[in-house]
């Protein structure tokens, strides 16, 4: 950066700052040129050359470290020169011919989105390349691989709307619904939880259903919610450790006391809808 205030802020967080020359801080400056200059400065300080140069940007704040790891791992294949992060972008697209003043389709046949050929859009999150392909005008080699990321990770902040979207993702709460439906208890528990889940669309909701109760599985498959099945308490607790929910909502009618103690000891916030179990006391 050429900005002393930005440099001061990031240095407080332990970040090494590369001073950007003022002549490379214009709106017309290519990012390739900026990265090339920063790379040369760092190599001069280190008295060494890098093997791989990776560009990640603060405008893509939802990028996960494991995604960055996957991008780096791709370079184990020495045929790969560069790796770019992309997101699925299948759509019917149009262009505009300035010379003729006419719009034209980028597709040959109108199809449902699911039937369109796979196309991708660069996210701006990751652009990694081998050192020998980094120049003042390019950061791409000859053999380019793509790493497809989730729509959440692909959020790039360029507008206030993008900021709002990123903020909603960052404020998402993981919520687990433990619920069943079978002949003896009916379907009311399931539909009650589905009703609650419909008001939690901005959060990460997962249903946990006993795999021996096919009725509950059939119902949840009719809705667009994630779900996992389990066979017993220990397996369910293991799934919770993987998902790491902030809130667990139990609606099975007869929750065991021992199960509730296990959840409490692990620090989960618990909501119960009980009918006959001890855990409602």
Regions found by a protein language model. Give the residues of each.
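Short internal beta-strands
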Residues: 1, 85-86, 204-212
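Short phosphate-binding loop-to-helix
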Residues: 5-54, 62-70, 232-243, 254-255
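Conserved core of the sugar-phosphate nucleotidyltransferase
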Residues: 33, 37, 60-150
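Short aromatic-hydrophobic micro-motifs that form the base-stacking/packing surface
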Residues: 52-56, 249, 271
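Nucleotide-activated donor-dependent transferases that construct or modify glycoconjugates
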Residues: 172-184
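A short, glycine/small-residue-rich beta-strand->loop->alpha-helix junction that serves as a flexible
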Residues: 181-192, 215-216
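Short amphipathic alpha-helix
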Residues: 190-200
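Conserved small/polar residues in nucleotide/adenosyl-binding loops
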Residues: 279-281
């Amino acid at each position: 950066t050429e900005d002393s205030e930005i440099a001061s802020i990031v240095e407080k967080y332990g970040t090494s700052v590369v001073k950007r020359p003022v002549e490379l801080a214009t709106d017309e400056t290519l990012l390739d040129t900026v990265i090339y200059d920063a790379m040369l400065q760092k190599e001069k300080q280190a008295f060494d050359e890098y093997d791989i140069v990776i560009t990640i940007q603060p405008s893509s704040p939802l990028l996960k470290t494991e995604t960055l790891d996957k991008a780096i791992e791709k370079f184990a294949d020495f045929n790969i020169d560069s790796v770019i992060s992309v997101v699925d972008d299948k759509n019917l697209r149009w262009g505009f011919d300035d010379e003729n003043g006419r719009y034209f389709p980028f597709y040959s046949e109108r199809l449902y989105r699911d039937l369109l050929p796979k196309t991708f859009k660069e996210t701006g999150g990751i652009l990694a390349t081998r050192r020998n392909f980094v120049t003042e005008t390019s950061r791409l080699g000859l053999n380019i691989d793509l790493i497809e990321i989730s729509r959440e990770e692909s959020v790039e902040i360029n507008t206030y709307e993008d900021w709002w979207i990123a903020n909603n993702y960052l404020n998402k709460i993981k919520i687990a619904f433990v619920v069943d439906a079978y002949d003896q208890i009916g379907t009311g528990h399931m539909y009650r939880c589905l009703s609650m889940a419909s008001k939690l669309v901005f959060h990460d909701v997962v249903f946990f259903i006993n795999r021996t109760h096919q009725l509950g599985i059939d119902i949840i498959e009719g809705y667009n919610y994630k779900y996992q099945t389990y066979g017993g308490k220990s397996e369910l607790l293991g799934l919770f450790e993987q998902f790491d929910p902030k809130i667990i909502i139990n609606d099975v009618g007869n929750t065991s006391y021992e199960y509730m103690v296990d959840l409490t000891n692990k620090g989960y916030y618990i909501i119960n809808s009980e009918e006959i179990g001890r855990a409602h006391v």
